[in-house]
């Protein structure tokens, strides 16, 4: 089960994403945050596998976010989540693993989260016998 932190300053959107994530047994929503201060505290305390991060979340310049988060949890998968499609290039340049536009259909959002989590699992599994 992949442990997910959901970070967005819009409570309605957090609620919708929570309901969406709860439809999948492979995800465990371990925490929610509404600003970067809470994100940093939750990441440090809970050590999630993945964060769905509102790219415009208040609290810290975007150019520092991914590096600060990975300093706390090196294996953390970062999904940049934004209403602005033009943020995609910036998100990847700053180290995000996946970009999701908030206007995308729920099935696409779930698929992207699932793919990045499966990618981590396949990298962690050895491809040779363990004799």
Model-derived segments and their meaning:
Residues 79-81:
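Hydrophobic/aromatic residues positioned on beta-strands within the core alpha/beta folds
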Residues 8-9, 83:
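Acidic di-acidic motifs
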